[in-house]
Amino acid sequence: MRRFALTVALPKGRMFREAYEVLKRAGLDLPEVEGERTLLHGKEGGVALLELRNKDVPIYVDLGIAEIGVVGKDVLLDSGRDLFEPVDLGFGACRLSLIRRPGDTGPIRRVATKYPNFTARLLKERGWAADVVELSGNIELAAVTGLADAVVDVVQTGATLRAAGLVEVEVLAHSTARLVVNRQALKLKRAVLKPLIQRLRELSGS
């Protein structure tokens, strides 16, 4: 198995490029991305880059496979992982919202979401006796078809909701991209991570 000076976990998709560029600007010598089928980028002794699904980034960082990662706050709210979160990077802004069909005011008995842990906590805090249905595809469809009385999902512009004929009832949390750091790595690789964190704070204005 190859050994690296530092391993970075980044989410695939729209957040990847911005995360990659901001880490480069902060002075991290990231490897070039060689192709979509490459699971691990980097040369032995250098910086390695893992391209992961959003929900997998906190897991890889928490378990020490990667020392640092970038992921949305929405994912962190659902993950339950004990990670150091030193920098709000500011991009990838969205919100987690409660969504229903127009005019629906009845009790919520079933909620569909990609964020089951966050949603379960919300229901418990509010004393709502509702079931949580975890889905991975088009969450809005669950409300449109009546599979669920409400959905908890990410909203950016609201265009998707309007197109589906749904309404945003309540904003539950705001989300942006965050730098996350493995707590043990923060101690063991302090000489590398401390200046990187400081530079990212300067770049993000946080």
Curated annotation (Swiss-Prot):
GO terms for cellular component: cytoplasm. It is found in: Cytoplasm. The keyword Ligase does not apply. It comes from the Bacteria. It is an enzyme of class 2 (transferase). InterPro entries: ATP_PRibTrfase_cat, ATP_PRibTrfase_CS, ATP_PRibTrfase_HisG, ATP_PRibTrfase_HisG_short. It catalyses: 1-(5-phospho-beta-D-ribosyl)-ATP + diphosphate = 5-phospho-alpha-D-ribose 1-diphosphate + ATP. It holds the Pfam family HisG. Pathway: Amino-acid biosynthesis; L-histidine biosynthesis; L-histidine from 5-phospho-alpha-D-ribose 1-diphosphate: step 1/9. Its EC number is 2.4.2.17. Catalyzes the condensation of ATP and 5-phosphoribose 1-diphosphate to form N'-(5'-phosphoribosyl)-ATP (PR-ATP). Has a crucial role in the pathway because the rate of histidine biosynthesis seems to be controlled primarily by regulation of HisG enzymatic activity. This is ATP phosphoribosyltransferase. It comes from Thermus thermophilus (strain ATCC BAA-163 / DSM 7039 / HB27).
